Swiss-Prot record:
This is V-set and transmembrane domain-containing protein 2B. PANTHER family: V-SET AND TRANSMEMBRANE DOMAIN-CONTAINING PROTEIN, V-SET AND TRANSMEMBRANE DOMAIN-CONTAINING PROTEIN 2B. Residues 161-226 are annotated as: Disordered. Residues 29-143 form the Ig-like V-type domain. The keyword Iron does not apply. It is a single-pass type I membrane protein. Residues 1-28 form the signal peptide. Residues 29-263 are extracellular. Keywords: Disulfide bond, Immunoglobulin domain, Membrane, Signal, Transmembrane, Transmembrane helix. Residues 285 are cytoplasmic. Disulfide bonds join C49-C127. The chain crosses the membrane at residues 264-284.
Length: 285
């Protein structure tokens, strides 16, 4: 029985040895790399970076975050096609170190946090891991691109949109009515201003105005029409107004309309009328 237990215990040794051998032989590598990100101005972002050293022995590991600004133009296409963790060709003399973390072990990780990003924060960010497991220090790099979009559109674009909105909504909705009102106002102003033109006499010394051929004909027709109108008005007045004697009788009978009315004897009225005619005859001789 004990012999079987020993053989069973020995049966677990090969897998354990194989696992330890794999840990020892496995190469160091990133377990988490930063990725390209596009954000708007004022947003907060995080870029992860994690690294595992080779073997199970505790080593000294150091991780650094660097800001490389904008990469060279000839590398932009290569950056778009390459894997984020394998970008080790982007170098910049103006690189700026952001942070440094150092641990004793075989795993290390550090997240880069940027709050309220600005347009000038756009560029390449690099995670550098220094592995001191061997006599020669090994350095591993992983890069990611940060793109920052403006939160607001340029002022000229806003002005263009406002003008476009006014042009598209204003005239279509109120254009015909405004045009009709403008035409009516223009016609009214012409109607009121035309009578005044004939009243104004030209200043002295100015050349005589051109006479329209139709004006004399209109004047002649007006002159011919004026006597006819005068005669008709006179006839109407004569037919409408009674003789003087009858007017006296009417005034005596009906009164002037403002004072008191008195009842008069018809005989007295005839006598007064005869007296009036007699006086006219005397005055005539």
């Amino acid at each position: 029985m004990e012999q079987r237990n020993r053989l069973g215990a020995l049966g677990y040794l090969p897998p354990l040895l194989l696992h330890a051998l794999l840990l020892f032989v496995a190469d160091a590598a990133f377990t988490e790399v930063p990725k390209d990100v596009t954000v708007r101005e004022g947003d907060d972002i995080e870029m992860p970076c994690a690294f595992r050293a080779s073997g199970a022995t505790s080593y000294s590991l150091e991780i650094q975050w660097w800001y490389l600004k904008e990469p060279p133009r000839e590398l932009l296409h290569e950056l778009a096609l390459s894997v984020p963790g394998a970008r080790s060709k982007v170098t910049n003399k103006d690189a700026t170190k952001i942070s440094t973390v150092r641990v004793q072990g075989n795993d290390i990780s550090h997240r880069l946090r940027l709050s309220a990003v600005r347009l000038q924060d756009e560029g390449v960010y690099e995670c550098r891991v220094s592995d001191y497991s061997d006599d020669d220090t090994q350095e591993h790099k992983a890069q990611a691109m940060l793109r920052v979009l403006s939160r607001f559109a340029p002022p000229n674009m806003q002005a263009a949109e406002a003008v476009s909105h006014i042009q598209s909504s204003g005239p279509r909705r109120h254009g015909p009515a405004s045009a009709a009102n403008a035409n009516n106002a223009g016609a009214a102003s012409r109607t009121t201003s035309e009578p005044g033109r004939g009243d104004k006499s030209p200043p002295p010394g100015s050349p005589p105005a051109a006479i329209d051929p139709a004006v004399p004909e209109a004047a002649a027709a007006s002159a011919a029409h004026t006597p006819t109108t005068t005669v008709a008005a006179a006839a109407a007045a004569s037919s409408a107004s009674p003789p003087s004697g009858q007017a006296v009788l009417l005034r005596q009978r009906h009164g002037s309309g403002t004072g008191r009315s008195y009842t008069t004897d018809p005989l007295l009225s005839l006598l007064l009328l005869a007296l009036h005619k007699f006086l006219r005859l005397l005055l005539g001789h």
